[in-house]
A protein has these predicted regions:
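Residue-level marker for buried hydrophobic side chains located in beta-strands
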Residues: 69-71, 163, 189
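A short small-residue
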Residues: 11-14, 93-98, 186-192
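Acidic/histidine-rich catalytic neighborhood of metal-dependent amide-processing enzymes
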Residues: 107-181, 185
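Active-site metal-coordination/substrate-binding segment of hydrolases
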Residues: 66-132
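Histidine-centered active-site/metal-ligand motif
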Residues: 74, 176, 192
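Active-site nucleophile and cofactor-binding loops and adjacent substrate-binding regions
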Residues: 47-50, 103-107, 138
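N-terminal helical capping/dimerization or prosegment-like subdomains
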Residues: 1-81
């Protein structure tokens, strides 16, 4: 059972997967993480909202009835952009104290940190609350993976605390911006 990972090496491995969205193609990256987490004792389930657009949920049951700590992030990245890169965007090249690659900060290093933390928690505190990792596809173009999971009955479950690894200029936050879609219908007399 694997219980430790080198977070930098895991970041570099994740950067080697081209998950630029569109088209996304997160399945291989999700399966790579799923295997690592299964080896660490987690139960892993995969959810596709489209072909090769795979999200995953990995769970480690706790030893009591408290809700688990949950970690969440996304597997896809934004496009490379018009400017050419000085380093291969899929190499995970390390230069000094920086690692370069598409998605390094948003958010493959965050996912590597979450996986490393979850595996350490599992190893060092096995009798405590459970751990759930939720890694979604399609965040960069409308959060389709998260919407898919939210639409499935009783897939996500409860969480005692949620850690979202989106970059926030290295400041821990208790809240973060998001989006909300509303449809409102009113009746009455039109006037101004």
């Amino acid at each position: 059972m694997a219980t430790e990972v080198n977070t930098l090496e895991l970041t570099r491995d994740l950067l080697s997967f081209n998950t630029i969205n569109p088209p996304g193609q997160e399945r291989q990256c999700a399966q790579y993480l799923g295997k690592l987490l299964e080896d660490g004792g987690f139960k892993v389930a995969y959810y596709d909202f489209d072909e090769s657009r795979t999200s995953l949920i990995a769970r480690l049951e706790g030893r009591h009835d408290k809700p688990p700590i949950c970690f969440s992030g996304h597997l896809d990245t934004v496009p490379l952009g018009a400017e050419s890169w000085s380093k291969d965007p899929f190499s995970g090249e390390v230069d000094g104290n920086r690692v370069y690659g598409r998605g390094a900060s948003d958010m493959k290093a965050g996912i590597a940190a979450m996986v490393g933390s979850a595996l350490r928690l599992q190893k060092n505190f096995p009798e405590k609350a459970g751990i759930t990792l939720i890694f979604t596809a399609g965040e960069e173009t409308g959060s389709q993976g998260a919407s898919c999971l939210a639409g499935l009955n009783q897939v996500l479950g409860q969480c005692g605390a949620l850690v979202v690894g989106e970059p926030t200029s290295n400041y821990p936050l208790v809240g973060h911006k998001g989006s909300l879609w509303l449809e409102i219908e009113t009746t009455g007399i039109t006037a101004h």
